[in-house]
Amino acid sequence: TDFSAGDSLVDEISQLQDYLAAGGKLLLTSSVYAQTPQLDAVLAQFGLARAEGMVVEGDSSKALYNSAWSLLPDYGTPTESTALNGVNTSTHVMLSVAQGITVTETEDVTAEPLLNSSSAAYAKVDINDLTTMEREDGNADGPFALAVWARNEDTGAEVLWIGCPNMDNEQLYQSMPGNLTFLQGCAASLVGQDVLVDTKALEAEPITVAGSTAAALGLTFVFVLPAAVLIAGAVVVLLRRRR
């Protein structure tokens, strides 16, 4: 739901505006299914806006196998934000049903993407009536920024916006530890901690297989290995007959 405004008992949007004007820090996630015009107006002051539609990855190595909407984005290379300091960027972050974020150059604002789709990604706009996940005419082309940091240089206010509402659940942390460390890095940067102190893992890190890798492994185990076994067996039979 959106923030309430002046016609409500509590003017949440004015409170948020005052907080940011005083140099406040904001970490938020958003859903492609939710409309929040009050909040969007605040984010526009930082040059940030929603890109219409749900991002679908066209590069199978950048999404989970057979799930092109479950994105495995690339990390950005920020020079001002410290959100990725100490984050192990070799681990995957997974964003499912995500939306892009556009960045418009704005006076007195510095903004940097932290997570990006590949250039093969595209956006499906009519998400309530999808008939295919394949690219169609009219789909917006990537790459898309999926998480963005911005700072107002006058007030010191910072916004860190992630265009996915479900990356911060406990079950996902178990299978995608990169989500947890990314969020830890984001939170640490907003409270002035430049380097993320990694905690000792209590469980073995699960293996995440991208779509292209999974397909190659599937072909290997279904076709290549059985064929190799049959060929080897035929060779053994022929050698025995010659004896």
Where are the regions a protein language model picked out?
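Acidic, S/T/G-rich, low-cysteine, solvent-exposed domains in lumenal/extracellular/periplasmic regions
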Residues: 1-195
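Alpha-helical transmembrane segments
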Residues: 226-240
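Short, aromatic-rich amphipathic segments at membrane interfaces
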Residues: 167, 172, 194-221
